[in-house]
From Swiss-Prot:
It is found in: Nucleus. It is an enzyme of class 2 (transferase). GO terms for cellular component: nucleus. Pfam families: mRNA_G-N7_MeTrfase (PF03291). Its EC number is 2.1.1.56. The lineage of its organism: Eukaryota, Viridiplantae, Streptophyta, Embryophyta, Tracheophyta. Keywords: Methyltransferase, mRNA capping, mRNA processing, Nucleus, RNA-binding, S-adenosyl-L-methionine, Transferase. This is mRNA cap guanine-N(7) methyltransferase 2.
Amino acid sequence: MAVTPHHRLYEFAKTALIKIFAFPYATVCDLYCDGGVDTDKWGDAQIGHYIGIDASASGVNDARELWESRKKLFTSEFIELDPSADDFEAQMQEKGIQADIVCCMQHLQLCFESEEHAQKLLNNVSSLLKPGGYFVGIIPDSSTIWTKYQKNVEASHNKGLKTVPNSIRSENYVITFEVEEEKFPFFGKKYQLKFANESMFENHCLVHFPSFMRLAREAGLEYVEIQNLTEFYDDNRTQFAPLLGGYGSSLVDPRGKLVARSFDILGLYSTFVFQKPDPDAMPPIVTPELHDPENDQEEEWLWTQQASMDDGRVSRTDILPPADNEKGILGPGPADMRL
């Protein structure tokens, strides 16, 4: 069976995120490891130890069997626990597990079926991470999805229709909400996603980003970034265009820009990054990023401000880059699709 554009784009996004955050000999904990499908990506990043956690025995066994069948590039262990239901702290302390990176690449949104499940997952993440460690992954971009849905609702009202639509359609996918409603509940907003040329629906929940941030903060995690995948790609296009091209020449144009189909599909997802504070670390928390020559103008501005600060004329709050009104946690996503 041919690999669909959706799967190729998603695999690219995971690979790119791992390339940014992984480093040699790191300890990585993969929540809902899904049969260990990403172990090769972590191996390419030269990590030292991999911990695969899944809620199902089959997921854990499949991950272990896959790892055992491959070249052993790192040590590993596989644990059957539900990150959104079980209490990790006592069990992991007994094992002495502390991770540099905790990732959740494809299941976090289902934890937002209830506040209790989301809270449990984030508390578990915090207990797993070393001070200074990162929690990273990919989730549906609920801002983009909900704004598309609201546009459908508005259009139906303008047409004088009494019923509220329960779906979003494009050439590439159909999103169907279980309940027709015009409000965005913080938890439990379920929907099904079906991509063109795929027979199966995916079940998801919308992730209310402010609630995500609040629960993470209560669990002891600092918000770093939530970014729509189209922006994530554009910000790192110089580095990642060849990588994405390797997943299929039809995904980007000759200049490395996303073609319309790729933009539409990637726009449904966001990366997320949180960090567990390290009280002994200096300087303050920053987002790891790859150098992009297209950002040289901003870097020149920062150097200018740094020179002024060295002269004693600029305070710390004055040296932040100019605010970008097109980006923000309450509305990540394509510029015309923000709350």
